[in-house]
Amino acid sequence: MCSSHGSPTSSSPPKRPADPAILARLADAHCHPSDDECFEGALESNASSKLGTICAMSSSLENQEITTKLWERNKNKILPCYGLHPWFIHSLSLSNSPTVPTREEHYTALFPSSTDVSQPSPSLATLLPFLPPPLLLSDFLSTLTNNLEAHPTALVGEIGLDKAFRIPNPPELASSAKNSDLQTPLSHQIAVAEAQIRVAIRLERHVSFHSVRAPQDTVRLLERIRGEPDGWGRVHVCLHSFGGSPETAKQVQKMHPNAFFSFSTIISGRSPRFHELLRAINPDRLLVESDFSHTSQLDAQVWEVFEQICEAREWSAEECVERLETNWRNFLELEPEGTGGRRKTKKQRRLEKAPVAEEVDEVEESNPK
């Protein structure tokens, strides 16, 4: 998710016109039609899109319901995703008490002074009246569970970690800078992300994960979860608009056979090492995305990154679309029990189909507007 997904500006002109036949075989693995400012326009654009699948992320508390409405109007194309983005988790209370803390109690504890943790941040007094009322994490997880159970094909997303984000100043504070100096503590982000991942594991749903300025924190979080025998290897995680280095990507792939990577030109394409990064990804783990909320631009954005992959990997259009089509299908599958999340080789898949005799494997995003 990025501030740019409100802007139709493209990072570079396409080298050739978008081919509707190819788009129909592709899935936009991560986009934000729920954030489109015009709901009816989003419905119209989703319906006219040539893409085969639009993976519609939720991000805030408010747009979980909008995601459902988009899916209800276009069930053949929209794949709904539910979750809370790290930009919107500061209202969640980790308290085990059944009573929701007051606004002052919650935010005073969440945003302490950098010089005296027993005191609130000096910036909090001005922002406090504009911050959303607290909500227990347990209550949000109940809503997340209900949404996923009501939509058996839904994914968990967008969730993750973001060490660049600062709480925006409200429009009422017009004389202030765009963003405050308040940052949701990493420990809070990790707790919320991990809680949502555990819901995904329990319900066997795949995850779309956001990571900005937090490559090693993300690696450590995923490694800790992988170390527990709770079914993590059954589900897949998509590291969306991946902005880490090629070296980090290789590290993640080695440690997490259930990890996929989706790329957008609007975010990933900013990196001077973008093509090197695309080449560092196992061909079986590549996905494409737009990360856009302007639904009229989804096709163009996905086509743009499709062309970049063709160029970086020296693939023909047909080879590229075949790989991406297969990868998306594999991403949506659950891994068999006991595989540890390892992708099956072509040989293993051929053997599974054969008769069996009887018995005797960093770019950052900016804050929202």
Q: Where are the regions a protein language model picked out?
A:
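Short hydrophobic/aromatic-enriched beta-strand-loop microsegments
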Residues: 77-83, 236, 259-265, 340-341
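Short loop-to-alpha-helix "cap/lid" segments that border enzyme active sites
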Residues: 245-255, 270-280
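Short acidic/histidine-rich active-site segments
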Residues: 284-299
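Active-site gating loops and adjacent loop-to-helix segments of metal-dependent hydrolytic enzymes
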Residues: 84, 88-130, 163-182, 302-309
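Glycine-rich anion/phosphate-binding loops
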Residues: 127-143
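An N-terminally biased module of ancient metal coordination in phosphate/nucleic-acid-related enzymes
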Residues: 1-82, 88-93, 97, 142-145, ...
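His/Asp/Glu-enriched short active-site or ligand-binding loop at hydrolase and phosphoryl-transfer sites
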Residues: 256-271, 292
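Mid-to-C-terminal alpha-helical segments outside catalytic/metal-binding sites
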Residues: 1-12, 303-369
